[in-house]
């Protein structure tokens, strides 16, 4: 099954007494398939994390729909919602925020067993748990009896991925998950995401880093002020960018595309609300031009 967004928007009430409106995401549509890495790339405030949180049901869209398979996730409750979370999980930029600091790692995994696998025996659960930890490069004896503050950021990220694997997920929302990690750990986590793809999982990779998006993703969406300005197969978006904003972003990373240096500046670009609709440049490549 695939994850699909159709004309999704998110507007917040802001200002005194909520009289103002701020549109964080505007009319966004795309589909993430199992077995592919799909990158959302944009600067701070582009709406990429808001999209990830809506997919995880942490936020509700103001308009549009998000479907998993044929089901609108807004309609899910109780058992159906629990099953959705068996298939779709998220890992965020700050791994410490996902843990209760007073619980050791084994207690955190124990709660996952109680919630999702109460019928599994203790011995079988330990076998599954150890296999999941080892599959993400962790030694169970080194991490299970430690508190979150005793583990590194990279270890905590891997624990979250191991928990997701225990649930037998089909999609992972990875929101800026390597931005706080050192260089060697970043490589390890990127390799882990590539391994998840090889297992047939879909990964929504949310990042502001064009180099990482280019390196890891099969398809790419470029966001500006909550709207899609360009979308398609990564090699086409990066190899032949059509929207001036995409060209400007690539020009800021010379090792990606030094040829996109025509002098376009952010202040020269139209506001996203004035963008024309996306048109298909060629098969697998759309841009708002």
What are these regions (language model features)?
Residues 233-289:
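Charged, flexible cofactor/metal-binding loops and thiol motifs
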Residues 16-19, 73-89, 115, 237-241:
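ABC ATPase NBD coupling module
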Residues 41-43:
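The feature captures the beta-strand-to-loop junction immediately N-terminal to the Walker
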Residues 64-72:
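Conserved ABC transporter NBD signature motif
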């Amino acid at each position: 099954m695939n994850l699909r967004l159709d004309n999704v928007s998110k507007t917040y009430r802001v200002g005194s007494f909520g009289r103002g409106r701020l549109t964080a995401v505007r009319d966004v549509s795309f589909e993430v398939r199992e077995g592919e890495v799909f990158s959302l790339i944009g600067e701070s405030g582009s709406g990429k994390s808001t999209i990830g949180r809506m997919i995880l049901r942490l936020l509700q869209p103001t308009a549009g729909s998000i479907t998993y398979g044929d089901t609108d996730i807004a309609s899910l409750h109780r058992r159906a919602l629990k099953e959705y979370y068996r298939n779709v999980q998220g890992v965020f930029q700050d791994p410490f925020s996902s843990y209760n600091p007073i619980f050791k790692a084994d207690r955190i995994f124990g709660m996952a067993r109680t919630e999702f696998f109460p019928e599994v025996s203790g011995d079988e659960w330990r076998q599954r748990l150890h296999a999941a930890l080892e599959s993400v490069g962790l030694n169970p004896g080194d991490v299970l009896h430690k508190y979150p503050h005793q583990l590194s950021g990279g270890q905590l990220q891997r624990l979250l991925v191991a928990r997701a694997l225990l649930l037998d997920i089909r999609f992972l929302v990875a929101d800026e998950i390597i931005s706080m990690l050192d260089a060697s750990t970043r490589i390890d986590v990127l390799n882990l995401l590539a391994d998840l793809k090889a297992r047939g999982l879909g990964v929504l990779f949310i990042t502001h880093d064009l180099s990482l998006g280019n390196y890891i993703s099969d398809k790419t969406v470029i966001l500006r002020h909550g709207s899609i300005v360009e979308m398609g197969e990564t090699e086409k978006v990066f190899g032949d960018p059509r929207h001036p904003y995409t060209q400007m972003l690539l020009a800021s990373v010379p090792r990606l595309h030094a040829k996109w240096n025509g002098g376009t500046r952010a202040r020269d670009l139209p506001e996203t609300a004035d963008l024309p609709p996306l048109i298909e440049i060629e098969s697998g490549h759309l841009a708002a031009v």
